[in-house]
């Protein structure tokens, strides 16, 4: 098997190792399923992620889509709580880092995303934390959002 293939088992091991006991096992499974769905999706919509998950697991598409929808509407799963595990995981072996803070406008939907990236030696950037905000709420608040990230 190609070592770069992201399987349910491999993603589950990674996510479980990252969040440890801070997230219920069923939530770890839901996050794992969503990650595998995203990696195998053609776009990032609930339907496409569910279809990607169904393709990998053999589930019926409607059931996989429902799983993704339930995860995203579950208020007990906090993105910021997951970031608290993601960032130390990515930075664990690093003694010194260079980061970039970037705003990206999405004119079509009236949103902006601010992201903090780890700049790597090979010229790419790994996203550490990000947040999307409505452009209409940016005025005089850009620095506040940057501080939050």
Regions found by a protein language model. Give the residues of each.
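Conserved, well-structured functional cores that handle cations and Mg-NTP chemistry
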Residues: 1-149
């Amino acid at each position: 098997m190609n070592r770069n293939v992201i399987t349910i088992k491999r993603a589950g091991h990674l996510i479980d190792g990252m969040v440890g006991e801070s997230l219920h096992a069923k939530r770890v499974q839901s996050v794992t399923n969503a990650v595998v769905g995203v990696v195998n999706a053609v776009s990032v919509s609930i339907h496409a992620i569910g279809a990607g998950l169904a393709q990998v697991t053999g589930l019926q598409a409607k059931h996989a889509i429902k799983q993704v929808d339930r995860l995203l509407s579950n208020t007990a799963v906090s993105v910021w709580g997951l970031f608290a595990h993601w960032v130390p995981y990515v930075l664990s072996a690093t003694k010194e880092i260079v980061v970039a803070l970037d705003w990206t406008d999405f004119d079509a939907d009236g949103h902006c995303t601010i992201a903090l990236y780890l700049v790597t030696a090979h010229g790419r950037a790994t996203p550490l934390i990000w947040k999307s905000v409505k452009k209409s709420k940016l005025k005089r608040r850009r620095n506040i959002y940057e501080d939050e990230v």
